[in-house]
A protein has these predicted regions:
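Intrinsically disordered or low-complexity boundary/linker segments at protein termini
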Residues: 1-42, 157-172
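Structural beta-alpha unit
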Residues: 3-6, 14-25, 100-133, 170-172
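Small/aliphatic-rich secondary-structure junction motif
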Residues: 23-78
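General small-molecule cofactor/ligand-binding pocket signal
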Residues: 59-61, 109-113, 164
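Short, hinge-like loop/turn segments at secondary-structure boundaries
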Residues: 75-79, 127-128, 151-152
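A short acidic, glycine-rich active-site loop
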Residues: 79-91
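Glycine-rich, Arg-bearing micro-motifs that act as flexible, cationic patches
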Residues: 132-154, 172
Length: 172
């Protein structure tokens, strides 16, 4: 596949061309990582359209991070009960199933993972031999980004798999 990339001439020191041609390998598998944010629909749609245009398989993944964090311990109610954990995973699977239905393709594969967001996304991508990871990214204020970090940023720093980031909000 040949991809033309628009660039400013000062971005590429060794070319005066407006477009640079790059050779890429065929993209066969696309992993779309989703959370419960309302912007997940946009991320799923953009990732799916991209995968469809390349004739690639689509995998949707949702990560349930640190189940204890979902507990109501701040209300002194203790950790989650097993039933609640199962319900949380079931709700996550239903979320992915609804997304799959919305995209209208039964061949989309879904998976709910438990653990650290970034680690699970990378592990899943490696297990499935994914060619590109699609994620959303909230555009936070710089201080929030420094303090809170970003899952997409962590994934980007820890993987060599190409990523496609869908901006989901404008900067404040």
């Amino acid at each position: 596949m040949i991809v033309k990339v628009f660039c400013k001439s000062d971005d590429f020191k060794y070319t005066t061309k407006k477009y640079v041609t790059m050779k890429t390998t065929k993209i066969n598998k696309v992993l779309i990582a989703l959370d419960y944010d309302p912007s997940a629909r946009k991320v799923a749609e953009v990732g799916y359209q991209m995968a469809q245009s390349m004739g690639a398989e689509v995998f949707l993944v949702h990560v349930v991070e640190n189940l204890v964090a979902y507990s109501l311990s701040y209300l002194n109610m203790g950790p989650l009960q097993l039933d609640t954990v199962v319900e949380l995973k079931d709700a996550s699977q239903q979320f992915l199933d609804r997304t799959k239905l919305h995209l209208g393709n039964e061949s989309i594969q879904t998976e709910v993972k438990e653990g650290d967001f970034a680690d699970c996304i990378i592990e899943t991508a490696n297990e499935l031999d994914i060619d590109i990871i699609v994620m959303g990214s909230l555009s936070k204020r710089w201080l929030e980004n420094i303090v809170l970090g970003s899952v997409s940023e962590r994934v980007m720093k820890q993987t060599t798999i190409p990523m496609f980031i869908v901006p989901t909000k404008k900067r404040d």
